[in-house]
C-alpha cells in the first residue's frame, strides 16, 4: 500500500481531523487565530493524527473520540514546533518562513502555550483518566527532551545513547501517545494497547532518524528547510556522531570543532565527504530501517484489516522518503 492509498483510506477521517484542528484553534484573540492558522496551514505530514485514526480503525472504532485523539496529539506537536523554532532561531520550515520569523518570538511562544493548553482541554473531553495521565507524562518527557537537546548543543561528547534518549523524548514518545490513546479509546485489549504503543515508539524513532539523515542528504526545496541546519546549530545527531567516532584524528577534530562552534555551514562539504567515506548516513538509515521493522513486528497481533496494512505500510514508507 503506497502513501496515496493510505491517504485515500483515511481521507474522510483526516478531513474531520483538519476541521477539528481549525475549529479548536479559534479564539477571540486575533493574533492567536492569525499565527495558529499560519502554522497549521503551512503543510506538514500529519503523521501523528494519521497514526491515531488508523490505529482506532484497526481495532474497529470509528467514533468522534478518535478524531479528538488525533487533534490533541497534533496540537502538542504543533506547540512544540513553535517553541522549537524559537529556541533554534530557525527561520524556515516546510518551505516558508517560520512563525517566529513572521510574527516574532514572543507571539510564537505564547501561542504555543495556548495550543498546549487547548490540547489538555481536548483530552478532558475524552473523560479518560488514563489518557490524561499518558498525555501529561508525555508532555513532561517532551519538555525534558527539549532541555537535554539544548544541553547537547555544541557538545561533541554527546553519546549515541544520549542522542537516542533525546529522540525518544522529543519524537517517539508522542508517536506512542497517538497509537496508545487510540487503542484505549477503541477499547482494545491490554496486549493490543501495548502492541500499538510499541509500534508508535519504534515508528517515531525511525522517523526522527530519517529526518536526521535527510538534514545532510536532501535538497532544501524537498526538505522544506535549509540543508545542514543541524550542523549549523551545533546539534550532534547520529550521522555526525558516527562520522566523528569513525574518522581519523584530523577528521574527528574537524567535526568536533564544527559541533563546538556551530554556525559553520561552510564546513558542510567537508563533513559530507567524511560521512560518505565512513558510510555514516547509511549507518543511521540502517538503524532507522531496523526500528521500522520493529514497528511492523509489534502489531502483528492486531486483527487483519486494510487499516492494519496501512499501519504496516506507513512504517516502511517512513524510512523511504526524501522529505
Report each predicted region and the residues it spans:
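All-alpha prenyltransferase/terpene-synthase fold signal
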Residues: 1-323
Amino acid at each position: 500500500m503506497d502513501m496515496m492509498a493510505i491517504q485515500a483510506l483515511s481521507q474522510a477521517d483526516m478531513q474531520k481531523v483538519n476541521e477539528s484542528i481549525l475549529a479548536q484553534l479559534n479564539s477571540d484573540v486575533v493574533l492567536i487565530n492569525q499565527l495558529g492558522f499560519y502554522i497549521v496551514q503551512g503543510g506538514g505530514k500529519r503523521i501523528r493524527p494519521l497514526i491515531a485514526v488508523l490505529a482506532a480503525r484497526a481495532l474497529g472504532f470509528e467514533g468522534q473520540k478518535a478524531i479528538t485523539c488525533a487533534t490533541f496529539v497534533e496540537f502538542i506537536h504543533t506547540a512544540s514546533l513553535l517553541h522549537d523554532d524559537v529556541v533554534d532561531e530557525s527561520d524556515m520550515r516546510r518551505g516558508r518562513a517560520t512563525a517566529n520569523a513572521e510574527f516574532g518570538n514572543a507571539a510564537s511562544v505564547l501561542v504555543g502555550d495556548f495550543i498546549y493548553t487547548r490540547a489538555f482541554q481536548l483530552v478532558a473531553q475524552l473523560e479518560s483518566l488514563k489518557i490524561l495521565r499518558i498525555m501529561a507524562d508525555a508532555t513532561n518527557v517532551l519538555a525534558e527532551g527539549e532541555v537535554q537537546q539544548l544541553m547537547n548543543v555544541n557538545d561533541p561528547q554527546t553519546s549515541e545513547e544520549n542522542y537516542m534518549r533525546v529522540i525518544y523524548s522529543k519524537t517517539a514518545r508522542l508517536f506512542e501517545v497517538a497509537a496508545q490513546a487510540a487503542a484505549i479509546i477503541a477499547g482494545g485489549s491490554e496486549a493490543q494497547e501495548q502492541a500499538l504503543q510499541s509500534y508508535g515508539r519504534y515508528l517515531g524513532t525511525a522517523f526522527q532518524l530519517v529526518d536526521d539523515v535527510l538534514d545532510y542528504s536532501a535538497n532544501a526545496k524537498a526538505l522544506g528547510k535549509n540543508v545542514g541546519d543541524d550542523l549549523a546549530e551545533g546539534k550532534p545527531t547520529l550521522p555526525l556522531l558516527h562520522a566523528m567516532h569513525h574518522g581519523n584524528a584530523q577528521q574527528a577534530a574537524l567535526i568536533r570543532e564544527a559541533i563546538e562552534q556551530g554556525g559553520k555551514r561552510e564546513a558542510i562539504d567537508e563533513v559530507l565527504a567524511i560521512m560518505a567515506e565512513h558510510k555514516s548516513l547509511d549507518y543511521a538509515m540502517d538503524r532507522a530501517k531496523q526500528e521500522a521493522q520493529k514497528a511492523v513486528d509489534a502489531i502483528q497481533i492486531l486483527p487483519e484489516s486494510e487499516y492494519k496494512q496501512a499501519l504496516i505500510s506507513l512504517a516502511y514508507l517512513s524510512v523511504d522518503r526524501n522529505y
